[in-house]
Amino acid sequence: MAAKDVKFGNDARIKMLEGVNVLADAVKVTLGPKGRNVVLDKSFGAPTITKDGVSVAREIELEDKFQNMGAQMVKEVASQANDAAGDGTTTATVLAQAIITEGLKAVAAGMNPMDLKRGIDKAVVAAVEELKALSVPCADTKAIAQVGTISANSDSTVGNLIAEAMDKVGRDGVITVEEGQALQDELDVVEGMQFDRGYLSPYFVNNQEAGSVDLESPFILLVDKKVSNIRELLPTLEAVAKASRPLLIIAEDVEGEALATLVVNNMRGIVKVAAVKAPGFGDRRKAMLQDIAVLTAGSVISEEIGLELEKVVLEDLGQAKRVTITKETTTIIDGSGEETIIQGRVSQIRQQIEDATSDYDKEKLQERVAKLAGGVAVIKVGAATEVEMKEKKDRVEDALHATRAAVEEGVVAGGGVALIRVASKVAGLVGDNEEQNVGIRVALRAMEAPIRQITKNAGEEDSVVANNVKAGEGSYGYNAATGEYGDMIEMGILDPTKVTRSALQFAASVAGLMITTEAMVTDKPQDSGSAMPDMGGMGGMGGMGGMM
């Protein structure tokens, strides 16, 4: 086992604080409308330019192992805030640095760290309750656009694009961000249910210009197995031909004789038909077939539940107003499913989301909800260069997370004003002893840090601005973008309550742990000279020549 290097008490805390300051100082320059960019060197390709706090934090590793421990713990604050609310990472880092700095001063002055932590925790619990009381719902498109604009570094185009996307696909709709091909940002909205499976044969194409299969009022056959024998499909084909309507077959696969016969029938005009593979794999495929069945008022033909393909009747088939199939995607528009049954299915999937443990499962389940309940919107980010594209895509993703958080828990006045108001309301809080009171004061003082940093980044005097804002009431604050004072909500400077709450809670949690640290243990650096054994004795191998 490698030898360890151990530091105690003040020595440990000083080293830890040095690491905290290196990381926090690099991150906090990005805060606010006049925050600066940070350039990150990459081992390959062009450097990345970003204004995203968590992206900066993730890049920082320090040579000194004790300093690095401090930096990594604050990095955890940014990561947790990012995971919980998708934004507020810089605010969380600034709050953590302020609490740690003030807290360690109090510890150095002889205060009991455990009571300090209890005081900080009490202040944060009270502050979170006050934040919730200050919060106002964010339901209208204008407020959503304002939140998106602030989070995207005051880019109103991004804010409006996100608001439009949410308006079109609803709160439950999936909004994804992709790199576009043009210079301008674009919004692409897919109505209905779309999945990533295209036609199985180009001979199904009936819209030559678009290279797609367009089916009007089709029947939809859902099969949970491979279909290779045409005899299994004949009863369905005959029934559909009599009804003079097209047919879409969604199966695990359609191959061999079955696919060839379908192509021939389609080309001769006997029955208008197209076939696609079912989306997903394994259990997820079964679930998605069931989703399509609910959406189209059909049944999944599966031998597991005793339904055989040869005995299918028209009542087993789903229906939709229109289906469009391209080489890569299938879109079912306006399925015939009953709204109450669809909502029941959505509620069932939402319950699975709550029970899911992995982020991947949650994401896939959320996509299924969106396909059933709303739709899918794709924001295509436009930029002149690859470097700008990456930076802008980061900002758009941040803004998207912020707007989702705003819709979820409402909004408060932005620009650090909400924390100032909360601190003044909690100022009368009293702990169980004087050391807890110091902890409460540490937390309340730290709540001024975001507005001070926003002001510093704008090149103004932070103490003057902080005192002016404290003298005001309600949403009165400082707009760092214009240098004006006024009502932050009226000026459209809003922060999602969830983002502010998460930043405060995670910052206090990690800062409390660091304040109560008394010893730090790390591996001793290995002397590179002694890493390899002496190879000098190998010279004697020259005598082995006689073995030839």
Curated annotation (Swiss-Prot):
Documented EC number(s): 5.6.1.7
Predominant cellular place of this UniProt entry's protein: cytoplasm
Superkingdom in the source lineage: Bacteria
GO MF annotation list: ATP binding; ATP-dependent protein folding chaperone; isomerase activity; unfolded protein binding
Compartmental location: Cytoplasm
One of the record's GO cellular component terms: cytoplasm
Residues binding ATP, per UniProt: 30-33, 51, 87-91, 415, 479-481, 495
Pfam families in the cross-refs: Cpn60_TCP1
InterPro entries: Chaperonin_Cpn60_CS, Cpn60/GroEL, Cpn60/GroEL/TCP-1, GroEL-like_apical_dom_sf, GROEL-like_equatorial_sf, TCP-1-like_intermed_sf
CDD domains referenced in this protein's UniProt entry, alphabetically: GroEL
Reactions performed catalytically: ATP + H2O + a folded polypeptide = ADP + phosphate + an unfolded polypeptide
Entry keywords, A to Z: ATP-binding, Chaperone, Cytoplasm, Isomerase, Nucleotide-binding
Subunit and interaction comment: Forms a cylinder of 14 subunits composed of two heptameric rings stacked back-to-back. Interacts with the co-chaperonin GroES.
NCBIfam families registered for this protein in UniProt: GroEL, PRK00013.1, PRK12849.1, PRK12850.1, PRK12851.1
Family indicated by similarity: Belongs to the chaperonin (HSP60) family.
Protein name: Chaperonin GroEL
Organism: Aliivibrio fischeri (strain ATCC 700601 / ES114)
Originating gene: groEL
